[in-house]
Amino acid sequence: MKGKFIVIEGLEGAGKSSAHQSVVRVLHELGIKDVVFTREPGGTPLAEKLRHLIKHETEEPVTDKAELLMLYAARIQLVENVIKPALMQGKWVVGDRHDMSSQAYQGGGRQLDPHFMLTLKETVLGDFEPDLTIYLDIDPIVGLARARGRGELDRIEQMDLDFFRRTRARYLALVKDNPKAVMINAEQSIELVQADIERAVKNWWKSNEK
């Protein structure tokens, strides 16, 4: 039986790492033990090199379109070399970010042309998409404060507050229009967030159970 692809999305400081643990815990309860974890950008040797270029300052400025193209290069390497093979083997994949991140950060935050974004997505990914996306919603002020508490911020995390407000607004619009996405209030206590995530996964499981 083919596996399923679950993605966790959200701004910096939303708690994606904890959410991943919650999802895996629920899957184990449901009898799904063979779970693969991925992150974007990254997840393959080439994709990890691209991740470093995307997240760190380089000798020359990285243009917005160059950033987006590197993200898609890393994404398709991960999809074709890791995610699709795992799904075909019946494994489940839990991803830290996927295409919705690019639509929100580069489409919303960077304000890149929507037509260009859509064309690139369709050209690179075709109809491939997650079976379930869990979006952790958080006010950028709260999220960035949490991120700063973890230590030094990367190149994208250093963007101004308006960038993250635009990114969040795009996330909210994307989730509203996506029947395969659920939104979780990530400003709650970690216990309530975990409970909401577990409930969302179980409800999705029941509605898709054959």
UniProtKB/Swiss-Prot annotation:
Its EC number is 2.7.4.9. ATP binds at G10, L11, E12, G13, A14, G15, K16, S17. InterPro entries: P-loop_NTPase, Thymidylate_kin-like_dom, Thymidylate_kin_CS, Thymidylate_kinase. It catalyses: dTMP + ATP = dTDP + ADP. It comes from the Bacteria. GO terms for cellular component: cytosol. Pfam families: Thymidylate_kin. GO terms for biological process: dTDP biosynthetic process; dTTP biosynthetic process; dUDP biosynthetic process. Keywords: ATP-binding, Kinase, Nucleotide biosynthesis, Nucleotide-binding, Transferase. GO terms for molecular function: ATP binding; dTMP kinase activity. Phosphorylation of dTMP to form dTDP in both de novo and salvage pathways of dTTP synthesis. Belongs to the thymidylate kinase family. HAMAP family: Thymidylate_kinase. This is Thymidylate kinase. It comes from Haemophilus influenzae (strain PittGG). The lineage of its organism: Bacteria, Pseudomonadati, Pseudomonadota, Gammaproteobacteria, Pasteurellales.
